[in-house]
């Protein structure tokens, strides 16, 4: 029984081999299309060349002048569909095509965005006159007459400093056209001085290291709903308090400078309970006689000295 099964399997294997051989003979006997063979050979050549060197990814040494025309289509980003060399290069200065930022013909101001007008250093928005408060020029070139009198800051309108040293410059806020008011109860309070959640840092009564008399954004008067007359009253009280403190400091400095000077002899005599001795000059002021200077000592002796006018030169 086993012998018959093995013989059947062998016959089936031989039959399959015969069928495959006949199929191959039929395929080889078919006519060959020359266009198909040419396309297959080109694909093989391109595939082998891509392993050795890929020209589409090596753009380190190629430039717009070296690669032009049909060669650019092979190395550019759109090599499959073709692209214009001038469209693939974008200028980072003016965002134009066909040139780089080094060769850009336009002048762009990075402050106000003006093109072909001025550079960033000469932008009128970066210059502010300390005399008239307008933009576009400085105080040395201001056409308005010089203002003399008490110094007033044009930013916060206080007389404790000038506009150039105002502490509000780095925290100056631009108001919106339609401000949104928020309820005071919704604002979370937190003190940066004593870590309390009942008041702001500027309203803290404990001693602080901050030396700024003007209030910052962390105060009750600077809340979104406190933009009214109470805000002005708060600033007025703070300004008056600061002025009083400055006056007291100036008085203390003046009083310390005007203290009477006590000689060491007087203080020692007052401690010992005796009066200080009168100070006597050792020599009386000189008197001029016949062109000579005479001096009298406390003992009555007289000294004479020839003046420079009557000295005879040795030569």
UniProtKB/Swiss-Prot annotation:
- InterPro entries, A to Z: Air1/2_Saccharomycetales (IPR016713), TRAMP_AT-DNA-binding (IPR051644), Znf_CCHC (IPR001878), Znf_CCHC_sf (IPR036875)
Modified sites of kind Phosphoserine: 12, 16
Residue ranges annotated as zinc fingers (CCHC-type) are 89-106, 127-144, 189-206
The record's GO molecular-function terms, alphabetically, read: RNA binding; zinc ion binding
UniProt keywords (A-Z) are: Metal-binding, Nucleus, Phosphoprotein, Repeat, Zinc, Zinc-finger
Presence of keyword Metal-binding: yes
Pfam families given in the database record: zf-CCHC
Q: Where in the cell is it found?
A: Nucleus, Nucleolus
Query: One GO term of the cellular component aspect?
Result: TRAMP complex
| Residue stretches of biased makeup (Basic and acidic residues) | 43-56
Q: Region annotation Disordered: residue ranges?
A: 43-68, 244-315
Q: Where is the composition biased (Polar residues)?
A: 287-297
Q: What PROSITE patterns does the annotation carry?
A: ZF_CCHC (PS50158)
- Main site of residence? nucleus
Biased-composition ranges for Basic residues?
303-315
GO terms of biological process kind: nuclear mRNA surveillance of mRNA 3'-end processing; nuclear polyadenylation-dependent CUT catabolic process; nuclear polyadenylation-dependent rRNA catabolic process; nuclear polyadenylation-dependent snoRNA catabolic process; nuclear polyadenylation-dependent snRNA catabolic process; polyadenylation-dependent ncRNA catabolic process; rRNA catabolic process; TRAMP-dependent tRNA surveillance pathway
**Would you identify the family this protein belongs to, as annotated?**
Belongs to the AIR1 family.
Function recorded in the entry: Component of the TRAMP (TRF4) and TRAMP5 complexes which have a poly(A) RNA polymerase activity and are involved in a post-transcriptional quality control mechanism limiting inappropriate expression of genetic information. Polyadenylation is required for the degradative activity of the exosome on several of its nuclear RNA substrates like cryptic transcripts generated by RNA polymerase II and III, or hypomethylated pre-tRNAi-Met. Both complexes polyadenylate RNA processing and degradation intermediates of snRNAs, snoRNAs and mRNAs that accumulate in strains lacking a functional exosome.
Share what the entry says about its subunit structure, partners included: Component of the TRAMP complex composed of at least cid14, mtr4, and air1.
Instruction: Tell me the protein's name.
Output: Protein air1
Species whose genome carries this gene: Schizosaccharomyces pombe (strain 972 / ATCC 24843) (Fission yeast)
State the taxonomy lineage. Eukaryota, Fungi, Dikarya, Ascomycota, Taphrinomycotina
Q: Which gene encodes it?
A: air1
């Amino acid at each position: 029984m086993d012998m018959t099964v093995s013989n059947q399997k062998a016959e089936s294997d031989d039959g399959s081999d015969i069928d495959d051989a006949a199929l191959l003979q039929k395929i080889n006997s078919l006519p060959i299309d020359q266009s198909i063979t040419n396309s297959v050979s080109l694909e093989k050549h391109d595939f082998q060349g891509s392993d050795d060197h890929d020209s589409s990814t090596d753009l380190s040494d190629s430039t717009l002048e070296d690669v032009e025309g049909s060669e650019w289509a092979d190395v550019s980003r759109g090599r499959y569909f073709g692209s214009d060399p001038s469209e693939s290069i974008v200028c980072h200065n003016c965002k134009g095509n066909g040139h780089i930022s080094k060769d850009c013909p336009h002048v762009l101001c990075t402050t106000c965005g003006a093109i072909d007008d001025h550079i960033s250093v000469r932008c009128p928005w970066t210059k502010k006159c300390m005399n008239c408060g307008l933009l576009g020029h400085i105080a040395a070139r201001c056409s308005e007459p010089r203002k003399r009198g008490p110094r007033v800051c044009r930013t916060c309108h206080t007389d404790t400093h000038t506009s150039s040293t105002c502490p509000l410059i780095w925290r100056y806020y631009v108001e919106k056209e339609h401000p949104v008011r928020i309820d005071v109860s919704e604002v979370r309070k937190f003190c940066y001085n004593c870590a309390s959640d009942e008041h702001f840092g500027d309203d803290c009564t404990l001693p602080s290291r901050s030396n700024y008399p003007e209030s910052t954004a962390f105060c009750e008067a600077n809340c979104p709903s406190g933009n009214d007359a109470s805000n002005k009253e708060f600033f007025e009280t703070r300004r008056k308090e600061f002025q009083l403190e400055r006056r007291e400091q100036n008085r203390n400095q003046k009083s310390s400078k005007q203290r009477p000077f006590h000689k060491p002899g007087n203080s020692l005599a007052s401690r010992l309970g005796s009066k200080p001795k009168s100070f006597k000059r050792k020599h009386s002021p000189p008197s001029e006689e016949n062109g000579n200077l005479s001096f009298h000592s406390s003992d009555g002796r007289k000294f004479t000295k020839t003046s420079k006018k009557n000295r005879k030169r040795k030569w």
